[in-house]
Amino acid sequence: MMDLFNQRSVTFDEPIEMLYACHDKVRRFCGQLDNLHSYLVKDGCNEMVLQNIRQISQYFNVAAPLHHLDEEADFFPLLLQYAPHTKSHIDELEAQHQQLHNIWSALSEEFSCLQNNLSYLPDADVLNRFTSAYARHLQLEENLFEIGKQSIPTEELTRIGQLMAARRKT
């Protein structure tokens, strides 16, 4: 099939690239969230805003927890095996996963308020805490992805890619 955008598809055969692809989605969603408050002040809530909120909610309620599980159950243990010096960073990232979940809960509440009252203005501080926390998190995590690319044998990456794919089939 022709790729009009000259982008290669990423599969679980390349699990680190798949993790990067998830991060690209997070960055896109965080970009939307960075603009949400000012958009609502200027233009108010409309169907486009509600659709974006539904997409963002779907991602952070379903895909993000799976992504964190991919890292915690598969990638991080393997990285520790081949690059034990990353342990303190992994510990920090796992703690951040819980913090991100907690901030997401607060943001999800803000979304619920907006969906129930279209004139509601979500708390800008909650939006900013969420996007700022993810920006810091992604940077630290991607440093470990690069170490993983250099340290983890291809066969092991293939194995965790299969585990990640299987997790989504259940």
Task: Mark where each language-model region is.
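Small-residue-biased structural context
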Residues: M1-T170
